Regions:
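Small/polar-residue-rich segments within soluble enzyme cores
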Residues: 3, 153-160, 171-293, 615
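Short, gly/Ser/Thr-rich active-site loops of penicillin-recognizing serine hydrolases
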Residues: 531-536, 632-666
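Short, small/polar residue-rich loop motifs at catalytic or cofactor-binding pockets
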Residues: 103, 108-112, 321-325, 518
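Short beta->alpha transition motifs characteristic of CBS
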Residues: 127-137, 339-345
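Beta-lactam-recognizing serine transpeptidase/beta-lactamase-like catalytic domain environment
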Residues: 275-286, 332-370, 377-621, 627, ...
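Hydrophobic alpha-helical transmembrane signal-anchor segments
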Residues: 2-5, 42-43, 60-94
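Conserved, well-ordered alpha-helix/loop/beta-strand core segments that scaffold catalytic motifs
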Residues: 281-325
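N-terminal targeting leaders characterized by basic, low-complexity, disordered sequences
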Residues: 1-41
Length: 666
């Protein structure tokens, strides 16, 4: 039996020859044909292929790529770190605030506006509950309201109730992308009640229609209300010029409402709560900052005296067909303004019916030439400087040439032989020019002296009330006075003032020569109920007490003497000191003198002054225009009412009755 050989290991054969002849010349093993590898196109390492130059193989280095990737990653990391620092450190508070804003919702709790009362606590301006009528315009789309013309239908229903134009409401309701619109602000509870009842009717009809298989259209479902307050003036137009008014936002826009807006407005509060998905999170708690109500303002005004003054001036302005008029009543001892009335006026409850020209306070904002009521300042200067006494003789010719002007009195007369007291009683322009000419050795010196007294009396300076739009008057420097002004300013032409300044002049004389700045506010009452008096007004002595008393006696002659121009201001039982005025009026439209300013100023009782009353009427066109004739009766009417209201005792003595004239040769 033949011996068995062990299995052979398979060993790769030699490389194949390059050609067929070579392959044929080699023997092959019998057991297995030899398989030879085909030559590679690339030469083995260390060998160079035939016909080719030897070129080394270069492999790409990974280092630049790694560096580029590392740099990019580093920059990304730096950006992340910078952003992290910005969010966590630099702008942490800002992002926290944004997060809190998204997390929490807050709404404002409006502070209750303070009241304005008269000196007795009677409300002149107060706030009552009201509603802002709002809407969600999206709820008026055909999809939500189930009505194709919901905005038009709703506007037609709401317009008569709100008193607005239906077209305007339609426009507000036809904004489907908006979720909030204000249809009307500060409507009374009665208005909202009407709308609410109407909503109930439509909601009931919609429910029945839907139950019957209909669309259930409801064109008022998107109407809502927001509680607020509304400013009201219980006495209508009484003292409207003083009080002013508020705008549509409830902010003071005129008068004391504007001047004292900060005190009246208070501080709004806030309520903040957490929300999620637009819904309140009850477990997150609520942060509430309560609103602080505004302070109540107590005025110096007496409502009853204000009513009497306003009625008197309104009646006379209408009777005289005048442009306007004012009456001021002032406490001579304290400077407190008891009344400040304007005609025509306005009702701050309904500004839509008000004349724009009447919205201010003409008694403080009008500036005009006062005329003869200003002569009292000239007489004060003459007496205080000691250049004349009430009995000094003044010969008053029919005409007087000064500079390039020829001056005359209001009435034609022969030569008058008057005392200085008579010059004031008969309101002689010529006599006043002659008297004030004695104030200096030259006319320039006299001008300087007179100017200083006019300034002391407050001409050309604010009254001290700080009222919005108040005028300071016009008084040029004495070196700037024209030739004409040197002689017209002493009798009240060529300078300008407002009604409050005019009243203050007479209060200064009545108060013994001491000027007290007028006041309109007695004090404030805060949210704690404590009353804080207003600061005491500034005081300044203008003339001596002796001069003031002498002037008061001279002013009595204007009213009491049969030759005086103010006899219509007499009040039985009371001694009255006063002065008439009839000035040429500067027409702001025509730019020259046209028409007259009639006025009367005075105080009572003359022996113990308590009350000052000033009246002026601009451009009376019907009937008389002299101050003593049309303003004297108003003075009497208002002064009598004020004396009785304040329970002022009658005079206990007779007037001195200083001589008015003299006989030549005396």
């Amino acid at each position: 039996m033949p011996s068995q050989e062990p299995p052979r290991r398979r060993v790769p054969g030699p490389a194949r020859p390059r050609n067929a002849a070579a392959r044929a010349g080699r023997p092959r093993p019998a057991a297995r044909p030899e398989q030879r590898r085909r030559p590679s196109s690339a030469a083995p390492r260390g060998r160079t292929p035939r016909g080719r130059s030897r070129r080394p193989l270069r492999l790409g280095s990974p280092r630049p790529r790694l560096r580029l990737v590392s740099l990019a990653l580093t920059l990304v990391m730096i950006a992340f770190v910078v952003r992290l620092l910005q969010v966590q450190a630099v702008d942490a508070n800002a992002y926290a605030a944004k997060a809190e804003k998204n997390r929490y919702l807050s709404y404002t709790v409006a502070a209750e506006r303070g009241e304005i009362t008269d000196r007795g606590g009677i409300a002149l301006a107060t706030s009552v509950d009201a509603y802002d009528i709002t809407a969600d315009p999206k709820m008026f789309t055909p999809e939500d309201s189930k009505a194709p013309d919901a905005p038009q239908q709703a506007a037609a229903l709401l317009a008569p109730i709100l008193g607005v134009d239906a077209a305007g409401l339609t426009k507000k309701l036809s904004k489907p992308k908006s979720r909030y619109a204000v249809l009307a602000r500060r409507q009374t509870p009665q208005v909202w009640t009407q709308i609410k009842d109407l909503k109930s009717v439509f909601a009931e009809k919609a429910a029945k229609d839907k139950a019957a298989g209909g669309p259930g259209a409801n064109v008022l479902a998107g109407v809502f209300q927001e509680p607020t307050t509304k400013r009201v003036y219980p006495n209508g137009g009484l003292a409207a010029g003083i009080l002013g008014y508020v705008n549509a936002e409830g902010e003071g826009a005129g008068g004391l409402e504007s001047q004292l807006d900060k005190e009246l407005a208070g501080e709004d509060g806030t309520i903040k709560y957490a929300q999620s998905g637009g819904r309140r999170v009850p477990t997150a708690g609520t942060k509430e900052v309560p609103a602080v109500a505004g302070s109540d303002i107590e005025l110096t005004i007496d409502r009853d005296i204000q009513w009497a003054a306003q009625k008197a001036i309104s009646d006379q302005v209408a009777k005289s067909k005048a442009d306007r008029g004012y009456v001021i009543v002032q406490n001579t001892r304290t400077g407190e303004v008891l009344a400040m009335a304007n005609a025509p006026g306005f009702d701050p409850n309904d500004l839509s019916q008000a004349d724009a020209a009447a919205l201010g306070n003409a008694a403080l904002q009008d500036v005009y030439e006062p005329g003869s009521t200003s002569k009292v300042m000239s007489m004060a200067a003459v007496l205080e400087e000691g250049v004349a006494t009430p009995g000094t003789h003044v010969t008053v010719p029919n005409r007087l040439h000064r500079g390039d002007r020829l001056f005359k009195d209001d009435i034609d007369h022969k030569t008058w032989y008057l005392t200085l007291n008579g010059v004031l009683a008969k309101s002689s322009n010529i006599g006043t020019i002659l008297a004030t000419g004695q104030l200096g050795r030259t006319q320039a010196q006299a001008n300087q002296v007179l100017h200083s007294y006019l300034r002391k009396f407050g001409i050309g300076s604010p009254t001290g009330l700080g009222y919005p739009g108040e005028t300071a008057g016009i008084l040029a420097k004495p070196q700037d006075w024209s030739t004409s002004q040197q002689y017209t300013i002493p009798f009240g032409q060529g300078l300008s003032l407002n009604a409050m300044q005019a009243a203050s002049i007479y209060s200064t004389i009545a108060n013994g020569g001491v000027r007290i700045e007028p006041t309109l506010v007695r004090g404030t009452k805060g949210a704690d109920g404590r009353f804080t008096p207003a600061p005491a007004p500034a005081q300044r002595r203008v003339v001596s007490e002796k001069t003031a008393k002498t002037l008061a006696t001279m002013l009595e002659s204007v009213v009491d003497d049969r030759e005086g121009t103010g006899t219509k201001a007499q009040i039985p039982g009371y001694r009255v000191a006063g002065k008439t005025g009839t000035a040429n009026r500067v027409d702001p439209v025509r730019g020259g003198y046209h028409g007259y300013t009639a006025s009367f100023a005075g105080f009572a009782p003359a022996d113990n002054p308590q009350i000052t009353v000033y009246c002026a009427i601009q451009n009376p066109t019907k009937g008389l225009y002299f101050g003593g004739q049309i303003c004297g009766p108003i003075y009497k009417q208002v002064m009598e009412f004020a004396l009785k209201t304040l329970q002022t005792a009658p005079s206990g003595s007779e007037p001195a009755r200083l001589p008015v004239s003299f006989e030549p040769g005396e």
